[in-house]
Amino acid sequence: MRTLHFFFQRYIDTNSQKAMTSNVAKQSDHALSILNIHYGFLNSIADKMGDSSDILSDENMELLVSLAANTDFERTALIEADGTAYYDNGAIKNVAQRKYFLEAMKGQATLSDPLDSSIDQETRVILCVPVRCNDRIIGALGGSYNVTALSQMLFNDIFDDAGYSLIVTKEGEIIAYDGEPSYHKITYGDDFFDINKDRTLLSKNSIVNVKKDFSAGNDGLIKIRTDSNKKSDQYIAYTRLGMNNWMICYVIPVSDAQNSYSFIKS
């Protein structure tokens, strides 16, 4: 009987880990496709704006407002060649030294480093593309995108909302997270590796190997124990997000991940 129980438990553990790894990989691809769609929105509008003799024409400003109203961009900005940015809400700022603007003026579609908000504790990025007129770059078009909301949306229907997601740089800095506070005590800027280095690893992977996976953008999964008892066991699945060398992770109690196999346990 003990042998049978061991066999079933191993079966459940193996298949739960496979499901975790597969789900995180699929959601990473989904996230990248969503961002590519929004790059498509920007490029389409930028092409239209480039047809105007005046980059700040009334028609272009109307397109700017419409872009913000009809997409998931929270803010949009039309930027002149000198770095003066005109936002959909009427604000005017200078972004001449921002990396995303400088790269867009070189003809690249760019993604900014994460911008943390002290107001709503969420992380945003700027997507930016060049505006061309007769093959000459005359400005840039950008939109701010909430990656915390994106991360949350991706995993809303997985495992009955149990667990939480993280977006982490390859160096281990947490730049976005979601989920119920009861599941975690983390904040922006925390080091993913420091958080987990003193926890008990129940899988073959070591934290050193996880660091190597992050650096190389490889998929992986670890099983850890955060406390002294089995009830604290967690799976952490991770994969490359496909932008800015970031990784996306999903953390869930083992008991929740294995719920679908409860009929076998009983």
Residue ranges and their predicted role:
Residues 61-63, 88-117, 182-225:
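Extracytoplasmic/periplasmic sensor domains and loops in membrane signaling proteins
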Residues 89-92, 145-147, 176-182, 254:
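Short beta->alpha transition motifs characteristic of CBS
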Residues 196-265:
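Extracellular/periplasmic juxtamembrane segments that couple receptor/chemosensory ectodomains to their
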Residues 75, 128, 235:
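Short hydrophobic/aromatic beta-strand element in the GNAT-like acyltransferase core
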Residues 1-55:
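Juxtamembrane extracytoplasmic/periplasmic/luminal helical "stalk" adjacent to the first N-terminal
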Residues 70-72, 81-157, 161-164, 169:
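Extracytoplasmic/periplasmic ligand-binding sensor regions of membrane-associated signaling proteins
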Residues 140, 177, 247:
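Short glycine-/small-residue motifs
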